[in-house]
């Protein structure tokens, strides 16, 4: 029975769960309204990313289980290609969230809001990097579904992927700490 590597589950799947409080600005189109609009824009891209990311992970798990069960590895290469393509789509969606987050940092809002957006941007950047490496892993699997010849390279790639996801998780935690410390500026969205 061929054993391929098990992808660890991502500990943090991104979702900006906070909306910026408008405080006392009250100006339609002011920096707080702009910030809220930008966060909403980033959230839309991130929601689609999360859906595609989960779809890619499910496709990968199904292919991995089939290879390990002894099914034809060449047939599973197609499923791995599907996982890679879906992960690429997820990666593209996450790229779409980058710009609005950087625009929030440039607005004339409280320092804490800028720090929050900066931490989220760092998290998105780290996750984009990790997902790019995960796409590389899927490409390797397409060529060698049982990792007969590429196991060491795959393990190296996955080590880098895991480091990237850990970096992203740390940045998400920093952003959450900022939000928790500033509930008057950053309110939870339900």
Question: At which residue positions do the language-model features occur?
Answer:
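Hydrophobic transmembrane signal anchors and adjacent membrane-proximal interface regions, especially
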Residues: 4-5, 107, 111, 152
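N-proximal short alpha-helices
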Residues: 8-9, 29, 89-90
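Short, solvent-exposed, charged loop/turn and helix-capping segments
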Residues: 87-125, 178-190
